């Protein structure tokens, strides 16, 4: 092999064509021409390339710090927008935006300082435009009036008590307090026909239009506009709640409910009635329709005003007696409902002693009814109670039910006739048997039609538990147990014998009386227990051994109603020896049975 490991080249041979290896000297010499050298040394082919002026040393370090600060602030704002703004969360996931572990609070007015960077300002404009697009509703743009109303609402909401501000403005405008003309309804659901409404800052054109639009809703309109307040007295055709009234006026007047005060007027205040009456004569007040009755009552003078109606207790007693109201609450409520048409009821409501009057009325009605009941025979009582039952039923349902219980109907009718006549040792009926055989249903239906009383042995610890039998013609003790049988065997033998007993009465002296016919229901047959052998002759018993039948719809197959008993008594009136008493009951049907008022009903009108 050759020893040459490479090629030896002369670099001068390769690049001698374009590389100058030695400097070339110019033939022209400047040694003798120094002046020309100095003249050409300062000249240049390019003008003003170098500024030969004096340089001013600036504060370069301050400029550098300022640039670094702006750059750092810009980066900080970008990080805040990336990790804090909701736009970043929205970009990650639309559903993630609705998830929040902390409660939502209103943002502070200036949480972050406004930056001046170009890119940040562009991002802010994008976020603002997107938010505005989401919040723009489908309604047309608001008018100048809507903008003004929104500003008024915002001004009101700045106050801690908006209602107090409106009431102060009302008193400043009309010279009278809003509470002096109205009474307060705490519930927004309570209905009333008459409403007083004060509206703040309403457009004049809308007020004029409301005069015509409210005619279809109201029987009487009273309107007075004293800027910035507008006062309405509206008597609607039907009762309306506060919610309905505010919704109606908000629609008609284009105002927010914050700008409204609504309460019903005072109906018994003479001063309030005079305010409305005299105000209607003001030429600046718009009034349409007839005056409400409560304004006329308080302001106009008529032939009845000379003698103010005084309350007559006897009229109230007659009302309760005719309708058979014994309970104090029922008497008070039903009589107060007559105040719109009855002068005596109106005087009752104006009285400061309503509770005492109601108590006295209920007491007198019970006295009258007790005296009338004692005067009546059983036949008259039954006839009177059957007259109050409307329509007729099937008497055969009662007969079929008695036969269904394997009871001889003729035997039952004989015992039932002696029971109604309250004969000694025959005035107590016992219906015994297993549960669900119809014992309580049968006896309760008879108590219902004859308006009897039910005694409860649960009150036996009280000495007055037998007091209700003093005010009835028929009594019932339901579900008699061994404890009750022992009590009857020890203490009530004389009563079952038909003799007089001494009955303890609450708040009254003990009275002497006989027991009325008494019915008992029990699961115990005392006729087979010698423990109660002294009651065997005093109690007439019937066994109900068959379960009460029901149809496919779980309704009773035997209709034991008031109508059924009415038909039963009318059908068997003669068999029960009630015929003579029926004739007595028919006498004087056209005449009032009892008159407890001082006025002569037969005199001139």
Swiss-Prot record:
Location(s) in or outside the cell: Host nucleus
Chain positions of cross-link Glycyl lysine isopeptide (Lys-Gly) (interchain with G-Cter in SUMO): 514
Region described as DNA-binding region: spans on this chain: 145-308
Short motif Nuclear export signal, span: 92-101
PROSITE patterns found in the cross-reference section: SF3_HELICASE_1 (PS51206)
Sequence motif Nuclear localization signal, residues: 80-82
SUPFAM superfamilies hit by this protein: Origin of replication-binding domain, RBD-like, P-loop containing nucleoside triphosphate hydrolases
Residues of the SF3 helicase domain: 407-557
Catalysed transformations (reactions): Couples ATP hydrolysis with the unwinding of duplex DNA by translocating in the 3'-5' direction; ATP + H2O = ADP + phosphate + H(+)
Family the UniProt entry places it in: Belongs to the papillomaviridae E1 protein family.
Functional note: ATP-dependent DNA 3'-5' helicase required for initiation of viral DNA replication. It forms a complex with the viral E2 protein. The E1-E2 complex binds to the replication origin which contains binding sites for both proteins. During the initial step, a dimer of E1 interacts with a dimer of protein E2 leading to a complex that binds the viral origin of replication with high specificity. Then, a second dimer of E1 displaces the E2 dimer in an ATP-dependent manner to form the E1 tetramer.
Protein name: Replication protein E1
Taxonomic placement: Viruses, Monodnaviria, Shotokuvirae, Cossaviricota, Papovaviricetes
């Amino acid at each position: 092999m050759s020893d040459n490991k490479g090629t030896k080249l002369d670099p001068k041979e390769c690049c001698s064509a374009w590389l100058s290896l030695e400097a070339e000297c110019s033939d022209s010499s400047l040694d003798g021409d120094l002046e020309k050298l100095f003249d050409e040394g300062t000249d240049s082919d390019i003008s003003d390339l170098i500024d030969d002026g004096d340089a001013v040393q600036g504060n370069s370090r301050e400029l550098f710090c300022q640039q670094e600060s702006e750059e750092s602030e810009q980066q900080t704002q970008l990080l805040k927008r990336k990790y804090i703004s909701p736009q970043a969360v929205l970009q990650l996931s639309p559903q993630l935006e609705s998830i929040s572990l902390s409660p939502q609070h209103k943002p502070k007015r200036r949480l972050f300082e406004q930056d001046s960077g170009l890119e940040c300002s562009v991002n802010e404009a994008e976020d603002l435009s997107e938010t505005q697009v989401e919040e723009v509703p489908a309604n047309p743009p608001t008018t100048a009036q809507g903008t003004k109303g929104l500003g008024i609402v915002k001004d009101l909401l700045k106050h801690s008590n908006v209602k107090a501000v409106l009431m102060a403005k009302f008193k400043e405008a009309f010279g009278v307090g809003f509470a002096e003309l109205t009474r307060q309804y705490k519930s927004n659901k309570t209905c009333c026909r008459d409403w007083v409404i004060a509206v703040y800052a309403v457009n004049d054109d809308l007020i004029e239009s409301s005069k015509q639009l409210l005619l279809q809703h109201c029987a009487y309109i009273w309107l007075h506009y004293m800027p910035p307040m507008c006062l309405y007295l509206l008597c609607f055709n039907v009762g309306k709640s506060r919610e309905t009234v505010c919704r109606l006026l908000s629609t008609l007047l284009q105002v927010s409910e914050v700008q409204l005060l609504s309460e019903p007027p005072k109906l018994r205040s003479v001063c309030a009635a005079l305010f409305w009456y005299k105000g209607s004569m003001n030429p600046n007040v718009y009034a349409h329709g007839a005056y409400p009755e409560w304004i006329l009552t308080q302001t106009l003078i008529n032939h009845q005003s000379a003698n103010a109606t005084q309350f007559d207790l006897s009229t109230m007693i007659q009302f309760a007696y005719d309708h058979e109201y014994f309970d104090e609450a029922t008497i008070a409520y039903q009589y107060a409902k007559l105040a719109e048409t009855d002068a005596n009821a109106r005087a009752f409501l104006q009285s400061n002693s309503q509770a005492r009057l109601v108590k006295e009325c209920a007491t007198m009605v019970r006295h009258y009814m007790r005296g009338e009941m004692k005067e009546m025979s059983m036949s008259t009582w039954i006839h009177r109670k059957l007259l109050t039952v409307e329509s007729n039923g099937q008497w055969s349902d009662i007969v079929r039910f008695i036969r269904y219980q394997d009871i001889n109907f003729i035997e039952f009718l004989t015992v039932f006739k002696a029971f109604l006549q309250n004969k000694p040792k025959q005035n107590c009926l016992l219906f015994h048997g297993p549960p669900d055989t119809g014992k309580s249903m049968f006896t309760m239906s008879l108590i219902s039609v004859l308006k009897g009383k039910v005694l409860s042995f649960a009150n036996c610890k009280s000495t007055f538990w037998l007091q209700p039998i003093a005010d009835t013609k028929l009594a019932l003790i339901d579900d008699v147990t061994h404890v009750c049988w022992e009590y009857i065997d020890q203490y009530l033998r004389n009563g079952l014998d038909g003799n007089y007993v001494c009955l303890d009465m609450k708040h009254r002296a003990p009275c002497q009386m006989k027991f009325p016919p008494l019915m008992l229901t029990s699961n115990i047959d005392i006729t087979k227990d010698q423990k109660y052998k002294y009651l065997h002759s005093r109690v007439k018993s019937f066994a109900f051994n068959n379960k009460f039948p029901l149809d496919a719809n779980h309704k009773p197959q035997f209709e034991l109603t008031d109508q059924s008993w009415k038909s039963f008594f009318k059908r068997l009136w003669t068999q029960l020896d009630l015929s003579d008493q029926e004739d007595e009951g028919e006498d004087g049907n056209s005449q009032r049975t009892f008159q407890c008022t001082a006025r002569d009903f037969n005199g001139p009108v």
